Amino acid sequence: MELKWVSCRKQSLFLISCLALLCLASLDTISCESTQNATDFKKRSQTVSCPPDWIIGPNQTKCYAYFKNSTSWEKSEMFCRTYGGHLASLASSKELSFVQKLCNGNVSSCWIGGRSMNSSTSGFRWSWSDPKTPQWNQSMFPKVPIRTRCGNGNGSSSCRANICIAVTNGSSSIFGERCNASHAFVCAVDSDIKCRNCHKYLVILAVVSGLILFTTFAIILWLLVYKRSKKRRKSRKVSNPASSSSVVPPSWKIFTSEELRSMTKNFSEANRLAGDAKTGGTYSGGLSDGTKVAVKRLKRSSFQRKKEFYSEIRRAAKLYHPNVVAIKGCCYDHGERFIVYEFIASGPLDRWLHHVPRGGRSLDWNMRLNIATTLAQGIAFLHDKVKPQVVHRDIRASNVLLDEEFGAHLMGVGLSKFVPWEVMQERTVMAGGTYGYLAPEYVYRNELTTKSDVYSFGVLLLEIVSGRRPTQAVNSSVGWQSIFEWATPLVQANRWLEILDPVITCGLPEACVVQKVVDLVYSCTQNVPSMRPRMSHVVHQLQQLVQPLEVK
């Protein structure tokens, strides 16, 4: 495996290097082509865009438009700004000649962007309304004639304070006049320079770079996932089987019918264990190495083939946990089906709750709390550790076996489909028409989720605490009563200790402890499935209440 990992890593690094060289070659090609065509780039790759009906200027950087509206300089400037520009500013003799031709073809004079400025520090000077235009070129306009009532020449400083510039076709190329005078005007805006081939180069660069980055990221991600999965597989091999979600017990095998008859003494009544005979019965037996097992005999079925049966048992046998009854093997013989699982010494929970075995003693509070906690751990394993999740679907007192230390072991995991439908109906539709352990969404809408198991556990938890069955006869007047119909009035009256099983006479818990357990019961049995807690949360809550069992 290590050699394969090194080989894969070398191949991946080689692929990344090749892609990087390909990217550099592509970029060099683009760079060389750009360098060789640098001379013709401006001519062939750039286009100048102007607004409709505007004309490009001599320097290819501005667009100009003539407007014949006769108005003042201020209003002309405001109008030009609506286009995102200003009155025309002149930075060269070419621009002056261009604006003169644009204006003189229509009228005698037009406003442009020049205006007088008079300050106490710098004195009188000319400036342009467009701040991006260079300062006034004195060599171009050494002396601007002023045509106002101030007379020709520069006039007084007070007269020159509100003078604006216009172009003309007369002897003077430009002249100054009162800004409130009315003239046509010429506006200028920056041209929009577009690159024809730049977009193509950018697209090529983006595609090549994106491909390189995506491929590199995908390879790195694959390497990380592969390395992580490899570590996970190694850890599963050395981890504790109790924490694994798919550990196959080494003793799992397919038995012959002769082997089963031999180990159960031909399924004698002496070897028959207490249980539900309607499903075929359960018998005790022993393997050749002396290990005790239980053999569950299922009723004949013509709907399931041998291959399907073995497949289901194999899948169920992988679900190994200390609080789940382990499957040791199975047998299929001419339609007869048998399941062999580990023997749990103390038998089913319902016997200890309702019919204490001869020579046994009633369950005290600590025992019951330990049973509930270990059972919750087994269910939480099915919901949270197994992928995909396993829904038990048939959590009830007779499906919980107790070991010698009164730890719970959940039986029938993954085997609910082997129980005939009519038997399921008899189990779930209990006396009085109630549905016992089944969640309402499963009964009425056939919706089965892990939350259905949480509901069933809540019913069973109340049964463990109270010693009452999910449905039980009261008297001739009341008839049958569900466990919640009995418990709810006591809960509402805060009579917590009256909920306890009357056989609990020693080691009674405090009322607040019983209240916490009953609150957990009602939390698990809420009508809305999404409001029920996860089994891992239930385990945590119960572990906070568990007290060490008394050693007697």
From Swiss-Prot:
Topology of the protein relative to the lipid bilayer: Single-pass type I membrane protein
Binding site for ATP: 274-282, 296
Subcellular location: Cell membrane
All copies of domain Protein kinase, residue ranges: 268-546
UniProt GO cellular component terms: plasma membrane
Catalytic activity: L-tyrosyl-[protein] + ATP = O-phospho-L-tyrosyl-[protein] + ADP + H(+)
UniProt main location, coarse: membrane
Keyword vocabulary terms for this entry: ATP-binding, Cell membrane, Disulfide bond, Glycoprotein, Kinase, Lectin, Membrane, Nucleotide-binding, Receptor, Signal, Transferase, Transmembrane, Transmembrane helix, Tyrosine-protein kinase
Cytoplasmic side stretches: 223-552
Disulfide bond entries: 80-187, 164-179
Annotated EC: 2.7.10.1
Record-annotated active site: 394 (proton acceptor)
Extracellular face of the membrane: 28-201
Regions crossing the membrane: 202-222
SMART domains according to UniProt: CLECT (SM00034), S_TKc (SM00220), TyrKc (SM00219)
PROSITE patterns hit by this protein: C_TYPE_LECTIN_2, PROTEIN_KINASE_DOM, PROTEIN_KINASE_TYR
Domain C-type lectin stretches: 59-188
Annotated signal peptide: 1-27
Domain of life: Eukaryota
Residues modified by glycosylation: 37, 59, 69, 106, 118, 137, 154, 169, 180
Listed GO MF terms: ATP binding; carbohydrate binding; transmembrane receptor protein tyrosine kinase activity
Homology family: Belongs to the protein kinase superfamily. Tyr protein kinase family.
Protein name per UniProt: C-type lectin receptor-like tyrosine-protein kinase At1g52310
